[in-house]
Amino acid sequence: MAVVGAGPNGLTAAALLARAGFQVDVFEQADDVGGACASAERFPGATVDLGAAAHPFGVASPVFQALELERFGLTWRHPCIPLAHPLDDAPAALLHRNLEATASGLGRDERAWLRIHRHLVEHIDAHLANVLGPMLRVPPHPVALTRFGLPAMWSARALGHVAFREDAARALLAGSAAHVSVPLSGPLTASFGLLLNALGMASGWPVAEGGSGAITRALAAVVEAHGGRIYLGQRITSLRQLPARMVVLSLTPRQVLELDVELPQHVRRRLARWRYGPGSYKIDYLLDAPVPWADPEVGSAGTVHVGGTLDEIHRAEASVAAGTMPKRPFVLVCQQQLADPSRATTGHIVWAYTHVPRGYDEPEPGYVEHLVTQQIERFAPGFSSCIVDAHRTTASDLERWNPNLVGGDIAGGSMAGLQALLRPGPGLAPYTLSKHRVYLASAATPPGAGVHGMAGAWAARAVIRDA
């Protein structure tokens, strides 16, 4: 049994297959495991996350829990406040690891927030069982799916304006929905915001102690503990290179089509229709002091959504989708050091990224970095003067680092419309490319983007079923 790609999904598939008794060999092109869930020393004595940073899906992932990653070195660290969303001339909106505490800070929207989120938070495991898998199946918890589906079908923009009366609650919904880099007027975009916020209130938005790479190192340790082998620096161009009858590919459609592999023509056509989304542009900052947020509460939040009101975030994401870089982009900021002081021996590390149009070229190097810095400065006056050093990673840089991030698309393919649900296309066997031979386990399969390993888990299930 061979697995190509040692990111979270590939390693999860390998771990489950090794546990089930398969002899598993994992082949990874890079010099270390991790894929887009990795970390490294970017500044002297400072560890930064190269891709994913905060992990609401990771800490709640059913398969990560089943694999008992904490036994293999993973430790979750929680900040005092999971998420903050600063606003102009108003207190920041705060998402606490508690439903009632969050709602009590939302003024006139307290009751509406409780009404919309209570079932999600109190039955989060049932909701995750429904959504972290193929959509074309009988849901394990149909009543819960119906309860979630009614508000989830809305656009985030419409639900925010209809359900809430004030900017704070609307902003919390919009910021979390914007993670998938889709205009907030699109159908189903409310679902992303609702689910991420429910996860934050139920189990938090923690970071991995020592860096996000600790998650994939723990997965690799599970693989090896059950007799699996991991080969690094191995670029696979043909399945004939692999000494295995069955292969799991933790790749997106473009990489699959570039391989020398026999696939049915209808599968090739389906993969060729795959659409990639906007890119991401990442900046790591080294500061000589904590971020001077105008609202001090934001200084206790592990994740910060920087973008202003719901309508402002919608305009920014719509602009990106239309091919224009907004002057005021939506920015995701992570302050991992608050929960994990081991991240830096001196100074303060801040991780930030924004969405950029697909194929975007900066008018000059550092232009997007300047826009991101300005947005943070808007809610943290004096931020710029705290910067000791900064390292930018463009969308093109992301793809060079990890070919699965095509055009800097960190979701493995657009999460807009039906492609968010039917990945990598319509069909009852999304993880099977060629039965008894080739399987797919990446963010291009359900449930899509996020560090949760569930695509790998479902692919492993398909292999075990067919074997």
Where do the model's predicted regions map?
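Helical element adjacent to the flavin cofactor pocket in flavoenzyme catalytic cores
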Residues: 195-237
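N-terminal glycine-rich phosphate/pyrophosphate-binding loop and immediately adjacent elements
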Residues: 1-126
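Mid-domain catalytic core of redox enzymes
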Residues: 232-344
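A conserved FAD-binding loop/helix module that cradles the flavin
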Residues: 52, 441-464
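Conserved FAD/dinucleotide-binding core of flavoprotein oxidoreductases
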Residues: 101-104, 254-258, 286, 345-375
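Hydrophobic anchor at the start of a short beta-strand
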Residues: 22-24, 247, 283, 385
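Rossmann-like flavin
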Residues: 88-188
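A glycine-rich dinucleotide-binding beta-alpha-beta segment and adjacent secondary-structure elements
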Residues: 166-183, 328-332, 382-446
